[in-house]
Regions:
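Active-site cofactor/substrate anionic-group-binding motifs, chiefly glycine-
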Residues: 42-57, 74, 78
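Glycine/threonine-rich beta-strand-loop-alpha-helix active-site module
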Residues: 66-168
Length: 233
């Protein structure tokens, strides 16, 4: 986990890329990262590192199982060596499943939900966080919508080898997304806070600190959206 201003530009990403093979799948959502310059910056680093880039875009909020299967097929066909997920929790979740499914000969949904076994091989995954909220970059859980089965549920895929959190990448996130991310973070903290065991005081203390920080810094951002310190918190 690398978190600081300029952490991507200061050659950290380029250095890490040398640990992986030639082909990188660059996965992202809509055109947001192209409008704010993040796409050009990352592509420049990938090209300077001599990587062959396969793009996988239009990952939607609340990613679908069909979209993950589409990505897995693309990864297999192109012999992808690293998946680089750029975005928020939805992009990360989709890529966790892609990473696992691309290495499987069977359907990951049936594997986990019917056979109750879990994948053990993955395409390496890295994340660049541009939208705060879920903390998806820190675990291997993914929330996926299976449209055919009309189920929204959890799958367990890859955990990222590395994650970059540069607060400056969030400076162009609109106010609606700031508020959404704040409430998303609060809801996750409350899950732990109100969950069992009730006597786990350390977890409760951490959750309270997270909630206080989110409330305090969101109030700052409501009046000063480009406040770097509040974004970094």
């Amino acid at each position: 986990l690398v978190g600081s201003e300029m952490c991507i530009r200061d050659r950290y990403l380029g250095c890490l890329l040398g640990n992986y093979g030639e082909t990188v799948m660059l996965a992202y959502g809509g055109g947001y990262i192209k409008r704010n310059g993040v796409y050009d910056e990352i592509m420049g680093i990938l090209n300077a590192s001599g990587k062959r880039v396969v793009e996988f875009d239009r990952i939607m909020s609340n990613p679908t199982y069909a979209k993950a299967q589409e990505g897995a097929k693309l990864a297999r066909e192109n012999h992808v060596d690293l998946i680089l997920a750029v975005g928020g929790g939805s992009v990360s979740d989709c890529c966790k499943v892609i990473s696992a499914q691309a290495k499987l000969d069977e359907d990951i949904w049936e594997l986990e939900n019917t056979k109750h076994t879990f994948p053990t091989e993955f395409i390496p995954l890295g994340t660049i966080v541009t939208v705060f909220g879920t903390g998806s970059e820190m675990n291997n859980g993914a929330v996926i919508t299976h449209e055919e089965k009309k189920i929204k549920g959890a799958l367990w895929g890859a955990q990222a080898d590395f994650a970059f959190l540069d607060p400056s990448y969030t400076l162009s996130v609109p106010m609606k997304q700031i508020i959404s991310g704040a409430f998303d973070t609060l809801s996750h903290a409350m899950e732990t806070y109100f969950g069992k065991p009730d006597e786990n005081n350390l977890s409760d203390d951490i959750s309270e600190a997270v909630m206080r920080s989110v409330i305090r810094n969101t109030r700052v951002l409501l009046t000063d959206p480009e406040n770097y310190d509040a974004r970094s918190e």
